[in-house]
């Protein structure tokens, strides 16, 4: 038995990434500074019409593959789209704080990210159970372009049946946040660094 599968598809992708950043001094002596960052990214992929054709054949009287009579066993069409959105932001503070005769450095910051994803698939198959034996014998050996033509599509002939498994589709989101604070103290020839992360 001879069997092969042919796929014809078009795939489109789009991606975008953008950022805005800033650095600011909060005083004239430039002892305190603030840095911030805002970002957005987008990714999108679509397959608007993937066509999957399965061909089969039984062995002929000879053993030469060229003698095989090949027919189309099934035709499926698959549509899918996937989109991602990511929003992010962060802010960092750094300042010099006098503690008696010691100048300590204080740092702190926050970061957050929000991500969403949406995946939508749809799957269809061409059903030919309504065809008579003679019509089916003719239909299955047509070029696949003709099998999908409107001449064959009707309620009492070939019809398109949706076989989408809804469990494969999903929507998801994720929120992430973190922060930190730290202090650096010079102690003679050494620096003492202490901090906390959340």
Region annotations inferred by a language model:
Residues 61-75, 120-171:
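Flexible glycine-rich, low-complexity coil/linker segments exposed to the extracellular/periplasmic environment
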Residues 1, 5-49, 73-123, 159-191:
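Outer-membrane beta-barrel transmembrane strands
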Residues 57:
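Predominantly extracellular beta-rich ligand-binding scaffolds that present long acidic/polar faces
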Residues 196-198:
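Short, small-residue-rich loop/turn micro-motifs
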Residues 138-140, 189-192:
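Intrinsic disorder/low-structure terminal segments
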